[in-house]
A protein has these predicted regions:
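Bacterial signal peptide processing site
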Residues: 1-3
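Non-catalytic, conformational "gating/processing" segments within enzyme and secreted inhibitor domains
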Residues: 158-169
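Acidic, Ser/Thr/Gly/Pro-rich low-complexity segments that form flexible
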Residues: 146, 150-159
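N-terminal targeting/tethering segments
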Residues: 7-149
Length: 169
């Protein structure tokens, strides 16, 4: 994770299908990475620790993350690099857990399958709740211009599959 992950919307969309990581049989595209990245950022910011970091000025979310040195790292990496590394690690862990679930024949329940089938409708309701016109607008706002419904659904599916094994242990 070196340099910056920031790009204009056209470049992001043009590189959406570029494979940026591989682990086993799993491949992660740039657009899927966006979902993992922004979910990581949002999770951190909503945590007590993230609130603490912002309150004491160690992270300023109003400024670009690729311009701020991460106070959690001693190697000079930026907050953007920190979250990118965390997102890749999370994806790798989700893949490993999903693989273990498959190896142990742990399948999604009917309710979990239905939840995945209803991701679009759930996002549509969220978009309406926040006064947005579409799922695409909601996703653009939450995870960036290059990521779409399929990328968000991939995140949810991998999470659910991995949780089958994680919760079984």
């Amino acid at each position: 994770c070196k340099g910056t992950y920031t790009a204009d919307n056209d470049a992001v969309k043009a590189n959406a299908d570029t494979v940026v990581a591989t682990v086993g049989d799993h491949q992660l595209t740039n657009s899927q990475l966006q979902v993992f990245y922004w979910m990581q950022v949002q999770s951190f910011l909503s945590s007590d620790y993230g609130s603490y970091m912002m309150y004491y000025g160690m992270l300023d979310y109003s400024q670009p993350l690729d311009t701020q040195v991460c106070s959690l790292a001693d190697n000079g990496e930026t907050w953007q690099q920190f979250f990118l590394k965390e997102a890749l690690g999370t994806w790798r862990n989700y893949c490993a857990l999903a693989d273990r679930a498959k190896e142990n024949d742990l399948k999604l329940t009917k309710e979990e399958k239905k939840a995945l089938e209803n991701v679009e409708e759930t996002l549509k309701q969220s978009a309406e709740h926040y006064g947005l016109e579409s799922v695409e607008e909601l996703l653009k706002y939450n995870v960036g211009a290059g990521a779409g419904l399929a990328d968000y659904t991939y995140f949810q599916q991998l999470l659910m599959q991995g949780n089958k094994y994680y919760d079984a242990e």
